[in-house]
């Protein structure tokens, strides 16, 4: 999914923007409450869930449209996320003992139409605060490009694609065991 260009003609109505925004706020509340099984229900079977870091490029290279290679931190599907969650539920995932306390913040949502009916792109900025033990605190900052589609069974929404790009070029945290 390419980075979205804000196109006034492709923007959704305020009512639809509100509906999709509320769905995404509900989704991050599930993650903060460690309700991972409920969260999985919001993901489509054909989900693509990726995270990469930003790569610093020299100005002269950007002018020539030379893109440095991307560093992928994960490239998961729904089955792989189910496995990650099953591991977290065992109590044996050392990186999450004791479990992290998280707060997901989502802002600047731009929602636009796609070529498919009932499917929309959502570009947003996020901040994920993670606290664990007494002194371990981490901030993950970046942008998300989501694709959501209407679930014909429930008339709600499903996330069918999520691309997460961290703003950090160098990762200084111990692990990536939390969900974005």
Curated annotation (Swiss-Prot):
Catalytic activity: 3-phenylpropanoate + NADH + O2 + H(+) = 3-(cis-5,6-dihydroxycyclohexa-1,3-dien-1-yl)propanoate + NAD(+); (E)-cinnamate + NADH + O2 + H(+) = (2E)-3-(cis-5,6-dihydroxycyclohexa-1,3-dien-1-yl)prop-2-enoate + NAD(+)
Molecular functions per Gene Ontology: 3-phenylpropionate dioxygenase activity
Keywords, sorted A to Z: Aromatic hydrocarbons catabolism, Dioxygenase, NAD, Oxidoreductase
EC number per UniProt: 1.14.12.19
Residues making up the signal peptide according to the UniProt record: none
Metabolic or biological pathway, per its Swiss-Prot or TrEMBL entry: Aromatic compound metabolism; 3-phenylpropanoate degradation
Keyword NAD: yes
InterPro entries linked to this entry: 3PPDioc_HcaF, HcaF, NTF2-like_dom_sf, Rng_hydr_dOase-bsu
Origin superkingdom: Bacteria
A GO biological process held by the record: 3-phenylpropionate catabolic process
Presence of keyword Metal-binding: no
HAMAP family for this protein: HcaF
Primary role: Part of the multicomponent 3-phenylpropionate dioxygenase. Converts 3-phenylpropionic acid (PP) and cinnamic acid (CI) into 3-phenylpropionate-dihydrodiol (PP-dihydrodiol) and cinnamic acid-dihydrodiol (CI-dihydrodiol), respectively.
Subunit structure: This dioxygenase system consists of four proteins: the two subunits of the hydroxylase component (HcaE and HcaF), a ferredoxin (HcaC) and a ferredoxin reductase (HcaD).
Family in the record: Belongs to the bacterial ring-hydroxylating dioxygenase beta subunit family.
Protein name per the record: 3-phenylpropionate/cinnamic acid dioxygenase subunit beta
Species this protein is from: Photorhabdus laumondii subsp. laumondii (strain DSM 15139 / CIP 105565 / TT01) (Photorhabdus luminescens subsp. laumondii)
